[in-house]
Regions:
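Gly/Ala-rich beta-loop-alpha elbow adjacent to hydrolase catalytic centers
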Residues: 155-165
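N-terminal cap/lid segment of alpha/beta-hydrolase-fold proteins
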Residues: 1-44
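Conserved alpha/beta-hydrolase
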Residues: 65-89
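The serine-hydrolase catalytic nucleophile loop
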Residues: 55-65, 375-376
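Catalytic histidine-centered segment of alpha/beta-hydrolase-like enzymes
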Residues: 54, 90, 401-413
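Short beta-strand/loop motif that positions the catalytic acidic residue
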Residues: 358, 364-366, 370
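Alpha/beta-hydrolase active-site loop
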Residues: 92-144, 172-221, 231, 235-243, ...
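Histidine-bearing beta->alpha loop at or near hydrolase active sites
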Residues: 85, 395-404
Length: 426
């Protein structure tokens, strides 16, 4: 039985403001984590569904158990419907470019949701109003501290979702995009939505704590000044949130803004910028100073530290379930350079589209009876990638499992292997 989502809500895609359906799931111990200010244990995950025209959605029978497993292991999990899937607006694109941007949009909302939870807990659980002040729109909410662990984000996808995953830019590039968001744009709206959700969570945790404290005092079980831990008291899930955070007078559609054209240009230029972004990410994570050429411009929008606060440090990990390697899938594959990490033809000697899987902890898992890609080709790709990635890449071929994991015991084996890998990321 999959868990109930804490929130079901919508966000605009940073591609063209297409409305996307999203869910956020909470692990059981989230309230306790926030009350005890143990925010170093906060982890986020996003998992993408299969091809929408073939029935893919966030209710997919593989997506749901994988999401449930991640929740059980302590992740705050985000799932979503790509454009054209479920209740999301728009249509599935022929190039996949829109789906890549849809995924980036969900990365933004999950990342800033966790960022707000982190900051508020570190400030002594001083809960903020769900309505943003004007000052808060213009400053960052996360001030770094020495010894602060990077936020762990797991990015995953199943089948077509893994193809989209393979075309994502580095996590630091996505992070910068939201930190520099201009008020009224889709990216800014996503940051606002993330903060509103986080503040609602913090308020719910505090309300439950006060409820427990009052009930215990009335029973005489504890003294007046004793602490209490939160438990759920009949709260109905999920909380449904739609509409927009930004005042309609301030809201600017991405397709109407000069910035949207700049973002398209950046997407086209991504292969040339990949190495620079990876150097930037490595320097941030390892504490190395950046060269002048690698430094990002100071954020000026609502999402990041234009007030002098330190940037949010993020570590990315990747999970590919039943990756699709057949050349026949190029018609539905996302845009960009050929994906050598997925074994597609036309590999360029200079193409590094698979570098993210080589540089970050990655697990690929597939069945030996996959009908979309032969077991021989999957094993050859996985073996080669493992060799190139040294210790960062792991893979598992589940005997007898097909692409849809419908065989007896197949989903359980999938869950067990992913759980084992996730435990190594702590």
């Amino acid at each position: 039985m999959p868990p109930e989502p804490a929130y079901s809500f919508t966000i605009p895609s940073v591609e063209d403001d297409t409305t996307l359906e999203c869910r956020i799931y909470h692990p059981a111990g989230l309230g306790k984590t926030l009350l005890h200010h143990n925010t170093n244990s906060l982890r986020g995950a996003i998992f993408a569904h299969p091809y929408a025209p073939l029935g893919g959605s966030y209710d997919d029978p593989v997506v749901l158990p994988v999401a449930a497993m991640l929740v059980e292991t302590g992740y705050v999990v985000g799932t979503f419907n790509f454009r054209g899937a479920g209740g999301s607006h728009g249509k599935t694109s022929w190039t996949g470019k829109g789906e890549v941007e849809d995924y980036c949009s969900v990365v933004g909302v999950v990342m800033h949701y966790l960022r707000t939870l982190q900051h508020s807990a570190r400030q002594g659980s001083e809960l903020l109003s769900p309505v943003m002040s004007a000052d808060e729109r213009n400053v960052s909410g996360a001030k770094g501290s020495h010894g602060e662990r990077p936020l762990s984000i797991l990015l995953g996808g199943y089948s077509y979702g893994s193809l989209v995953l393979a075309r994502l830019p580095p996590i630091q590039a996505m992070q910068q995009r939201f930190e520099e968001a201009t008020m009224g744009t889709a990216a800014a709206e996503i940051v606002q939505r993330a903060r509103t959700l986080a503040k609602q969570t913090l308020k719910a945790v505090e309300d439950e704590r006060q409820h427990d404290l009052k009930a215990s005092r009335e029973r005489g079980a504890i003294p007046e000044d004793a602490p209490s831990s939160p438990v759920r008291h009949g709260r109905t899930f999920p909380v449904l949130i739609g509409g927009e955070e930004t005042d309609s007078a301030d809201r600017r559609r991405s397709r109407d803004t000069p910035r949207s054209m700049d973002l398209v240009r950046k997407s086209v230029d991504f292969p040339k910028r990949l190495k620079a972004h990876m150097r930037h990410g490595s320097a941030l994570q390892e504490g190395h100073p950046l060269s002048e050429g690698d430094k990002c411009h100071p954020p000026t929008g609502i999402g990041g530290g234009g007030d002098g606060s330190s940037p949010l440090l993020v570590n990315a990990h990747y999970l590919l379930v039943s990756p699709v390697l057949l050349p026949l899938t190029t018609n539905i594959a996302p845009p960009g350079p050929p994906a050598p990490q997925l074994g597609l033809r036309g590999r360029s000697a200079d193409s590094k589209a698979g570098a993210l899987f080589l540089q970050h902890a990655t697990l690929a898992i597939f069945g030996t009876n996959d009908t979309f890609t032969s077991n021989r080709r999957l094993r050859a790709w996985a073996t080669k990638t493992e060799r190139e990635a040294a210790r960062n890449f792991e893979w598992q071929a589940v005997e007898g499992a097909g692409h849809f994991w419908r065989e007896e015991g197949a989903v359980q084996k999938l869950r067990e292997r992913v759980t084992k890998w996730v435990e190594t990321l702590r």
